[in-house]
A protein has these predicted regions:
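ABC ATPase nucleotide-binding domain helices that frame the ATP-binding cleft
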Residues: 45-48, 144
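Helix-to-loop junction immediately C-terminal to a conserved catalytic motif
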Residues: 52
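Glycine/charge-rich catalytic "coupling/switch" loops of P-loop NTPases
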Residues: 253-280
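Conserved ABC transporter NBD signature motif
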Residues: 60-68
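ABC ATPase nucleotide-binding domains
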Residues: 33, 74-80, 84-231
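The feature captures the beta-strand-to-loop junction immediately N-terminal to the Walker
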Residues: 37-39
Length: 280
């Protein structure tokens, strides 16, 4: 059986007295698209940076494809990364930006040029090789950043809120393009986002984080329909909360009996979470 594309065991990280990551355990299968979802300050970006080697964990292990990379510097880890700010080199052409990693690996010029052409075609920017970042829109710059991240055919693609700086219409279009491209290439992808709609529409699985810990890992449907904690129920989607008393096979809200599964005992006071679409 092949090892997971990425495996984290007991990963912890603190900045002084502030604990950013609390005992993170997670496995990501090859070809999966996983979203780290949570509010600002929950630890999702720190976790991505630890995976990339841009931050060093205080404890725990990180393995990629069965290889322990816990102590390796970023340059020795097998990933491409796209930042929210694009991080393109303004003095380099589009072609040179995309080829940057290939040049560092001493890829022959002809092979690098062919790869650049292939990737720009793939991200919808054919013929843009000679342009410079300042001549491109935000959406086009993000496409160039994505092409650069994919140039070396990495085993892992890391995306740090790549769409959040774009306007709403471009964001929705790029969301679908990015997901289609990921499926076509089959590259294992981890994306950080605080946008629920983004995570629910793009991810194979969602990792919901809060205060440095993982609250739930599941498919979009599992996270939405079967939240593991009150935080997940409140954070993902909209929900109505009602005071209820448990009864056999359901709960009573005021004078109304609601049939629902529960693991409590009759007579217990609980909070009933109801999605708006379930109200008739």
């Amino acid at each position: 059986m092949a090892p997971p594309a990425l495996h984290l065991a007991g990963v912890q990280k603190a900045f002084g007295a502030f604990t950013a990551l609390r005992n993170i355990d997670l496995s990501v299968a090859a070809g999966e698209f996983v979203c780290f979802l949570g509010p600002s300050g929950c630890g999702k970006t720190t976790l991505l940076r630890v995976i990339a080697g841009l931050e060093t964990q205080d404890a725990g292990k990180i393995a990629q494809g069965g290889k322990d990379v816990s102590a390796l510097p970023p340059g020795q880890r097998d990933y491409g990364i796209v930042f929210q700010s694009y991080a393109l080199f303004p003095n380099l052409s589009v072609a040179d930006n995309v080829a940057y990693g290939l040049v560092n690996r001493k890829t022959p010029r002809s092979a690098a040029s062919a790869r650049v052409d292939e990737l720009l075609q793939m991200v919808g920017l054919p013929g843009s090789q000679a342009k410079y970042p300042a001549q491109l829109s935000g959406g086009q710059q993000q496409r160039v950043a994505l092409a650069r991240a994919l140039a070396t055919s990495p085993g892992l693609l890391l995306l740090d809120e790549p769409l959040s700086a774009l306007d709403a219409i471009v964001r929705v279009r790029l969301r679908q393009e990015l997901r289609d491209l990921q499926r076509r290439l089959g590259v294992t992808t981890i994306m950080v986002t605080h946008d629920q709609e983004e995570a629910l529409s793009m991810a194979d699985r969602i990792v919901v984080m809060n205060r440095g810990a993982i609250e739930q890992v599941g498919t979009p449907l599992e996270v939405y329909r079967s939240p593991a904690t009150p935080f997940v129920a409140d954070f993902v989607g909209r929900v109505n909360t009602l005071d209820a008393t448990l009864e056999e096979g359901g709960a009573r809200v005021g004078s109304t009996y609601v049939r629902c599964a529960h693991a409590g005992l009759p007579g217990q006071k609980q909070t009933l979470y109801v999605r708006p679409e379930d109200v008739m």
